[in-house]
Amino acid sequence: MAVGNGLILYHILGLASCIALVYFSLGEVDLRDALPSLPFSGGASRAAAASLPFVERRGKRLFLDGRPFYINGWNSYWLMDLAVEPNTRPRVSSMFRTAVSMGLTVCRTWAFNDGSYNALQLSPGHFDERVFKALDRVVAEASEHGVRLILSLANNLDAYGGKRQYVRWAWEEGVGLTASNDSFFFDPAIRDYFKVYLKTLLMRKNHLTGLEYRDDPTILAWELMNEPRCTSDPSGDTLQRWMEEMSAYVKSIDKKHLLTVGTEGFYGPTSSQEKLNINPGEWFPNNYGADFIRNSKIQDIDFASVHVYPDNWLQHASLDEKLKFMTRWITAHVEDGDGELEKPVLVTEFGLSHQVEGFEDAHRDVLYRAVYDIVHGSARRGGAAGGALVWQLAAEGMEEYHDGFSIVPSERPSMMRLIKEQSCRLAAVRYGEEGARKVLKTVCA
């Protein structure tokens, strides 16, 4: 479809969506005041978006429009994948509408798909324009719904290609140093592959908005990699060098957006024994090559990231033991942000799987509330906890994407209430109680 025709179609669809929204829900949440940087009219306006403020870091806090900005967000890694085909695109729209109805403001999602089904990058430096337009649509639609995006740029895991696909490409072209997946981090040819991808993505001109990604404030931050690990070098030096090189490269192209590494938060060789003791369980080796404090101190990294999965990491623990661990884990990392790092800390993934023996929906309510309480308490003190993003939310009819952690909000009323409550609490820190009720309307009524 030609760009011009695509723009016309998108304007029509945007207008139709707005009319339907008004017709069916007069009390719909209005995030225009909560996120004044994002337009709500049908169709994304280049002129309007280009003049909008970016989320920025000041010391250990995030700011937007001169006020501290705290994130109640979610993960939906699949947005680009479902935006490719016309018959699945409505699920993307549905997810954004549902999120906004709960006051959620930030979504973390994949901006990569390497060499697999619906691949964005077909081979090094060669991209599928059809899939790139799907990512354009995700960014434009996020803007229309008043949602910011954290876009992850690669995967340590094999899903959606991952670092293994880059290694396979180098091996097939006869330039790879080794077949080890960890060569992604030290092989010069593979590092060059990744830089080509980074430059192409950052300078991509959205066919719907006319903005290059590096100029679009809808994007809150870039994430170098989802859960980077380099087990072949437990010293952490290989992974550290890669993070330093790639973060500097991103910033050489895009100085407007925030940047994070994407780490899970494991303490490494440069950490004290006290910190190492916080790592989850004796079975969890300190040889992943990750080093939370060292990695997060990198000059070009704006905020630190933490993940927490107590049922995966403490498989035989009771609910109380998982709760104690999770509380200690998040609190320790927020304290790092307050102290040694002097940077914001975001819990970019947290979850509890329904596939664990003895699981009850109420267990999620208990553990997720604990995460939200830590973030809210830190926000009230002006601390380093910048927010938390649940893993993961899904739209109805997406069983094929369920991974044990997926939550369809309409099927979990108590979870919807909990998420809404957190949205209101963080809005109250930013705007005051009365301001929060005005900004989020029916969510905080």
Swiss-Prot record:
GO biological process: polysaccharide catabolic process
Annotated signal sequence range: 1-27
MF terms (GO), sorted A to Z: mannan endo-1,4-beta-mannosidase activity
Tissue: Expressed in stems and seeds, and at lower levels in roots and leaves.
Keyword Signal: yes
Keywords: Glycoprotein, Glycosidase, Hydrolase, Secreted, Signal
Pfam families: Cellulase
Family as reported in the entry's similarity comment: Belongs to the glycosyl hydrolase 5 (cellulase A) family.
Gene transcribed to yield this protein: MAN2
Record's catalysed reaction(s): Random hydrolysis of (1->4)-beta-D-mannosidic linkages in mannans, galactomannans and glucomannans
Protein name: Mannan endo-1,4-beta-mannosidase 2
EC number(s) stated in the UniProt entry for this protein: 3.2.1.78
Glycosylation (residues): 181
GO cellular component: extracellular region
Subcellular location per the Swiss-Prot or TrEMBL entry: Secreted
Species per Swiss-Prot/TrEMBL record: Oryza sativa subsp. japonica
Main subcellular location of this protein, as a coarse class: secreted
InterPro entries in the cross-refs: Glyco_hydro_5, Glyco_hydro_5_CS, Glycoside_hydrolase_SF, MAN-like
